[in-house]
């Protein structure tokens, strides 16, 4: 049997397992997730040893290193997240709409699983736990294609998950980890009839690859080219704190600030706006007006003149761009041209300007006077998320349990037939 044939055989088994998941009641699903959380401490050394093998192959200066890293604290957090998912209300079998037709037919629109969800992701082994929990809670089977950089970690995690599933007398094929080789991704992306939807989580290059090569429907998530616009009416202290938080809280995640846009009437305030960034050694790529305003006010080794490419970059590291604009309209145009439609923010005190920004900026999450770091399912009160959708169909913004469901119509009658 070729590797391609073996993968297809596994995909068929996952599809069969997905039909069994829908027969599980909510208590059985929650018990499995809680059991998995309870098993993590005993499995920690095995998982961390596998993770160390992955880390040894990566440069610690690589922005992906932090996302790849697991430790005891992060495993404890993962266990807590699993219990939190178990405690969430089930998104399944909810009556979304109901009506009685004039002919007496009773119609109900109810939430149901998507079926089999394929996830392609990079570096972050915690995603393996997160995705399984969210897919199971929403009644879906899961096919995972992790990156080769996290291969050892993902194998150890999936082995633990499948052990817990087997011990509870359930079908371990409800989760399947594809080989790390790139060819496996091509098979997944073209597994029409086996996979219901693909969700890529990672860099823009990964998302573009999935969109270009997939014949299975794709929900795009993750890539964020994020702006914060400091308006002429912005509060200086507020802007300074928001910029610092949005850039440095977790620079390797998709909601981190990439480009600060500053109204030219406030350019004299720019050194104060970015002064805290020096503490974290943030490298700044500034357009000429911003560069010369910061010269000798920000460390020379951390300051460069920006190129056009800087303004279309998702840095995922302690780097950012600064763009100065003459008008509010120019700020909107810059965002429209460079945004990935993930998260965008304004710092302003003029309500008319805030209202215009909120209405006219096209993004999944649009903020006024707060940090873009809040783009997160848990922060939105949605529970854990599978990613941040940057498209408009099916789901937009944090994809939590509800977004992992679709619906079907249930129609009950008393013998009605449709007239000729």
Curated annotation (Swiss-Prot):
It comes from the Bacteria. The keyword Oxidoreductase applies. It is found in: Cytoplasm. Coiled coil: none annotated. Belongs to the gamma-glutamyl phosphate reductase family. Pathway: Amino-acid biosynthesis; L-proline biosynthesis; L-glutamate 5-semialdehyde from L-glutamate: step 2/2. The keyword NADP applies. GO terms for molecular function: glutamate-5-semialdehyde dehydrogenase activity; NADP binding. Catalyzes the NADPH-dependent reduction of L-glutamate 5-phosphate into L-glutamate 5-semialdehyde and phosphate. The product spontaneously undergoes cyclization to form 1-pyrroline-5-carboxylate. It catalyses: L-glutamate 5-semialdehyde + phosphate + NADP(+) = L-glutamyl 5-phosphate + NADPH + H(+). Its main location: cytoplasm. One of its GO terms (cellular component) is cytoplasm. It is an enzyme of class 1 (oxidoreductase). Its EC number is 1.2.1.41. This is Gamma-glutamyl phosphate reductase. Keywords: Amino-acid biosynthesis, Cytoplasm, NADP, Oxidoreductase, Proline biosynthesis. One of its GO terms (biological process) is L-proline biosynthetic process.
